[in-house]
Amino acid sequence: MCGIAGFYHPQNIFQGNEKYYHKILQQMMNSLYHRGPDQQETALFDNCGMAHTRLSIVDLENGRQPMSRSIEGHRFHIVYNGEIYNLPYLRKNLQKKNLTPDTSSDTETLLLSFLAFGHSFIKEVDGIFSFAVYDEFHNTLSLFRDPFGVKPLFYGEKDGTVIFGSEPKACFCYPGFDPELDLSGLNEIFSLGPAHTPESGVFRGLHQVPPGCYVVFSPMGSRIHPY
């Protein structure tokens, strides 16, 4: 089990106020410490900040996150939580694009697969996972969740900033994005419990990436894609 968190705004340059936003990332990361006591790191980019807490399982030395890779000068970044069951198959697919992972980390294999094949690669992934990829060149943030929703991934928005995290409390570390009970969502959980309809939940404005879907945020807005 690991923890991921972060934020994204297509116009805001977070590095212009680096100390302030690094402090927010630190708070988000600290709230998820129990999910990953082996390693905790943050990274801040122009339009995105990422935090990760790691419980090391695969490639203990080389799987540090947030992880970054580049192709043709374009930079991509990932934070990931999960377990992939068909890594050899995914790595074989990368050979078709003349790409070879430098490590045995499943995180790197996922990121290189995104670089090579775009969002469609997720259809080939067998596992339980939630992860976020920030594409600097296209200025997009993509949030992915496994088909059965085993790994949690929450997100919300505050003044145009997208906030995401493995747990609600990580999202609520972002200034101004405060927990507010959604009475209709709460009623659903008590009536149907633990089931609830998509986009409904305990906290107003806080959503879960639906199982078997990815959400893309860009300067043009956001869209949920089933796969």
Where are these regions (language model features)?
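Cysteine-centered catalytic environments shared across enzyme families
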Residues: 1-227
